[in-house]
């Protein structure tokens, strides 16, 4: 949601999820230095063949040529995608939003001196309640609560940077114009007073309608209806001191030992299940570069995943 709101600014374009570090940088040993044209071409063609890139709403053919011309290093690869996105939308300034990049904010700050890091935080109980409904997310409360904790811990590593800014989701939806003005001031821009965020605006990015529609408070504290008291106690136990640190009040109920043991069992089941489901990905990842056509890999991966229906383990939820 924040990405789409900021991208309404006439000078700023925030690119969708590139997953640069997971899909590209971690595999740099397989592709080699990008100042070699053959290495660069192989990486560009493989990356641009993924569905994720097409969801960015860009001219993929033009992006390919731009990457071949300019992406002579891994930092330049990501920068080229961001710059192409802003040029494509006739904007002057660029940015990118991938949640997993919260673990890499220090690397990004070193690559791009003067970069701004906007750390968006939300009530962990609402985050977990939302993740429980996502097909791609873990099915256990324990694992989803740790996702919130680890992602925020990663982003906190750059709080000493001048470019770091903490934004609270609840304040953003309560006073969107005021928060957007604060963000713009932080990055050296001014939020146009005539620009309203009250109305729904179309977006070039493919993402759930909840993230693309008008700003609403309807999703605040949904956890009260969607999580059981024991699940809430688990989330608060894992969130720990960060719950109060970010301004959220505890529900006041401690998780019992039996609740923790049960949650760990469910989390363990889910972890093993996900490892099995992801076996094709791990194989493909560790055998790069490979001559296997990408469409054949995706065909096999989908068939493999269909063998494991998306379902929680028996009695997987804490009552």
List each language-model region with its residue ranges.
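PAPS-dependent sulfotransferases, especially Golgi type II membrane carbohydrate sulfotransferases
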Residues: 27, 156, 189-319
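Charge-dense, low-complexity intrinsically disordered segments
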Residues: 65-72, 138, 142, 170, ...
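A conserved segment at the C-terminal end of the G1
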Residues: 1-12
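PAPS-dependent sulfation machinery
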Residues: 13-96, 101
